[in-house]
Amino acid sequence: MTSKVVAAAASAFLSRTNELGNLQKSCIRILSFCESNSSRIGLHIHCPVIKFGLLENLDLCNNLLSLYLKTDGIWNARKLFDEMSHRTVFAWTVMISAFTKSQEFASALSLFEEMMASGTHPNEFTFSSVVRSCAGLRDISYGGRVHGSVIKTGFEGNSVVGSSLSDLYSKCGQFKEACELFSSLQNADTISWTMMISSLVGARKWREALQFYSEMVKAGVPPNEFTFVKLLGASSFLGLEFGKTIHSNIIVRGIPLNVVLKTSLVDFYSQFSKMEDAVRVLNSSGEQDVFLWTSVVSGFVRNLRAKEAVGTFLEMRSLGLQPNNFTYSAILSLCSAVRSLDFGKQIHSQTIKVGFEDSTDVGNALVDMYMKCSASEVEASRVFGAMVSPNVVSWTTLILGLVDHGFVQDCFGLLMEMVKREVEPNVVTLSGVLRACSKLRHVRRVLEIHAYLLRRHVDGEMVVGNSLVDAYASSRKVDYAWNVIRSMKRRDNITYTSLVTRFNELGKHEMALSVINYMYGDGIRMDQLSLPGFISASANLGALETGKHLHCYSVKSGFSGAASVLNSLVDMYSKCGSLEDAKKVFEEIATPDVVSWNGLVSGLASNGFISSALSAFEEMRMKETEPDSVTFLILLSACSNGRLTDLGLEYFQVMKKIYNIEPQVEHYVHLVGILGRAGRLEEATGVVETMHLKPNAMIFKTLLRACRYRGNLSLGEDMANKGLALAPSDPALYILLADLYDESGKPELAQKTRNLMTEKRLSKKLGKSTVEVQGKVHSFVSEDVTRVDKTNGIYAEIESIKEEIKRFGSPYRGNENASFHSAKQAVVYGFIYASPEAPVHVVKNKILCKDCHEFVSILTRLVDKKITVRDGNQVHIFKNGECSCKREETSFV
């Protein structure tokens, strides 16, 4: 009987009769014929039921209540329920179950309270629904009270109630209680076992889930397709072989491969990049639908197999299967991954044609695609603005995209707007906003978000905890970062890697290396993501021995082939003056990228092998590796140090005209330095005046340094004034200007400049040097000769060496102040305490002065020892009285 016929019959009959007995029977008969989508008929019946006072008839009301629930009219059903004068346990249970299925868990529990207050005794199905609502809310407290009622009413051994209770305890993390409850069940069936396995999988207890499956088989309980769907979910985390075993079990047991099970198998194989196996599952039987095909498309997308993903997408359409919102979302994700804006626009047009423009899933994928594929955020913002119901994923995608595009300030306004619209941000949203805080180094915002996380009790979650650590560390709040780490429930490599990265950025390289001990204390081993950070810290400290230990660790741990590790090793060996080792590591890189080549070119140039560095660059071009902005910074610096003026100018033009790389301020600084060292001050000034970017203080400082060397007082004063206008608290500008006045015969102006420094409470940046001896890094700071303790052992050793130099017949006498320079202290400490065969490697934060350079050079003539000093400009390798820089002392200006 069709809906229209039933509706017509109901209307005709009701208009002809007032006989209540017949009316009741007819209403029940009509309702029994109603189809699940015939809500209109329900309204036809409901009206006369109220009109003729038939709400006393329990069978009629229960039938009508069931009709409303079948047609998704849960709140209309609730209105009818409230109108009923007598409510049976069936009516209460049906309503509570409906709220539970609709995930209206709080409403289900509230209705249960009303039921208990009415004196109606719940049955096993009532308890099962109530317990499932408690599980949905993760409310173990209320669930425990319900459990007490279950025991009192004798339902604890019931498989339906017991399974729900086991699920509740599992979801609330009380696995011991869950297992004990399950063991007490009488005749646990397939559904009960599957629920327990599902709970364990949901709680990420993968091995325990497989163990339960094994016990299920031993108990002689046959698994069904839903059991295997859950087990495949566990296998995705346990490994390929586990999943293959489960697949074999499915075949051996003759479980029919329905669409749900096939989709789970496809998802499983695609996670392990076994797409050929996934396709075989797709073709294994005739039953297919859009969800199964979408799963295959998603698998190809996940594995970045663009051609196959698009081919499968087109094939499913040719078979008459209309892609759904998830299919289009997957294809748009592919466009995002391969940065294909044109194809993404085509898919966008298709979604509009087939009516998915209002789909939130498609909208989210479009926002992500436009953010990742466009140079601008405009189109993504337009799509977001047109969305009917943006959810938390929509807002989060937009926020993350804005962070990537550099619009970090806008993220905070979006977060406020999101909360205002009652969309609750999740941990990914907040992690994205914290990334914005890291870029801005905005500690106040970090504190605000941290407070919000504390109120929500999610500050200990690993994803958001890692973002908090990074945000605090980037804002120089290292103690706060450590407090977050200590409060986290779980920590991983990312937790410590972000901290090490920030320590390196802040110049706290010793602290970066100390993090290794904390990682090991947590049972976390360095991986290919964290190793480069520690190797970089070793490089910046000149800790060659530590760097070599990390190199050995990378080989033993199987990370020696990782490009990121090899690139960092090239940099480390170069900075430690061990160029042969750097070249050996470079040769191990299977396919050197631009970062690899930059490391080699930079290492050669900084160690004084300018010609070899330029040759390496030419080889890089021959190998068709495209240079980047950093490459040209390295080349310009090399030309500056090597006095290769014309070649430096040529590289600057090549960068712009051949490689279309727009020069940044840093490139102009080097260009000005090249011209300044060559005495071409007028050209250098012209570059500053005509550059398309606003010059910074460093450019004027570079020109001032050149003016000091060339004795150009008037231009030097002009550069100093312009530099101080931009950086009034930079002591280097005052010092350079004062030195220029001294050397130009203007001592009174020099003193006036130094007095101005004193008034502003500015002081010269202290020289700091480090030296590694027997795996431990020692630090030294330059001291004022008037304050130093001359009984200090290092000072005594320096004076002793100076006397030895005099006896050697060298004209070197040394500046008394220079005796306390940090580089000289570090060199002498390494000379005394390092093993006789070990070289001494020192790192200094400033350019090595003339006196210290001469001292170290003569020292290596007296003793057969290699001493390497890496200063703020280059690496100096001293051996047999000579330095690798091979430059006149003016280079130390």
UniProtKB/Swiss-Prot annotation:
It comes from the Eukaryota. GO terms for biological process: RNA modification. Residues 699-774 are annotated as: Type E motif. The keyword Oxidoreductase does not apply. It is found in: Plastid, Chloroplast. Its main location: plastid. InterPro entries: DYW_dom, Pentatricopeptide_rpt, PPR_At4g14850-like_plant, TPR-like_helical_dom_sf. PPR repeats lie at residues 57-87, 88-122, 123-157, 158-188, 189-223, 224-257, 258-288, 289-323, 324-358, 359-390, 391-425, 426-460, 461-491, 492-526, 527-561, 562-592, 593-627, 628-658, 664-694. It holds the Pfam family DYW_deaminase. Keywords: Chloroplast, Plastid, Repeat, Transit peptide. GO terms for molecular function: RNA binding; zinc ion binding. PROSITE patterns: PPR. The keyword Transit peptide applies. Residues 775-806 are annotated as: Type E(+) motif. Residues 807-893 are annotated as: Type DYW motif. GO terms for cellular component: chloroplast. NCBIfam families: PPR. Belongs to the PPR family. PCMP-H subfamily. This is Pentatricopeptide repeat-containing protein At5g52850, chloroplastic. It comes from Arabidopsis thaliana (Mouse-ear cress). The lineage of its organism: Eukaryota, Viridiplantae, Streptophyta, Embryophyta, Tracheophyta.
